[in-house]
Amino acid sequence: IIEDGSPDGTSEIVKTMQTEFPTQLFMIERKGKLGLGTAYITGFKWALAHNYEYIFEMDADFSHNPKDLPRLYDACANMGADVAIGSRYVTGVNVVNWPIGRVLMSYFASKYVRFVLGMNIADTTAGFKCYRREVLETIELDQIRFKGYAFQVEMKFTAYKCGFVLKEVPIIFINRELGTSKMSGGIFGEAFFGVIQLKMNSWVRKFPKKKI
């Protein structure tokens, strides 16, 4: 768990649970809100340093069902994927309890990203994924520049340009029952214009390649 000074008592709860799960539950505490992307990068680096072969990312509010974790793992371990994506849109629209406006914005945002970047991925903004460690070792994590929701797009696009296999696994996304989304106009703007920046940068950037 990457904890950025949340005011809801998360760190205290985790510390209590760590006494029960000392070899399974870990937490990195950071000062202030440093952004979604930097939190994931911090977690990825920790996982690589501790020699994990498969690294997952997911929301902590149960919008992503932990029961789907073995399916993402199986896609990477046994079905040839380098990155397994828990996809809301690969078999239609599998989202529960979102307002129709939010569903449409997310769905067409993924369509937009797919069109601009040329990735054959239905859910380009998904945040439920499993990576083989080789992916995170190859894509130069310190070169990932976006901190908001565009981070999710940048990670997929970079892995794609490096030659890794991305596979979508259908899931049902259930909106959180408590709390509120952190989506804002600024985050949406970063994602919209960030996609164009990613495409333009890809014309001149030399991406590291997957080892065969």
Ranges and model annotations:
Residues 1-6, 28-29, 58:
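Short beta-strand/loop segment that forms part of the nucleotide-sugar
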Residues 3-12, 62:
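A conserved acidic beta->alpha catalytic loop
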Residues 5, 89, 172:
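Short beta-to-alpha linker loops that shape the active-site pocket of alpha/beta-hydrolase fold enzymes
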Residues 9, 13-16, 42, 71:
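Alpha-helical transmission elements in cytosolic ATPase-linked domains
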Residues 19-24, 51:
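Short helix-capping segments at alpha-helix termini
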Residues 20-22, 78, 161:
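Short, well-ordered coil/turn elements that cap or connect secondary structure elements
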Residues 28-49, 54, 66-149, 176-193:
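Acceptor/aglycone-binding surface of glycosyltransferases and processive sugar-polymer synthases
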Residues 118, 142-212:
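Hydrophobic helical membrane-anchoring modules
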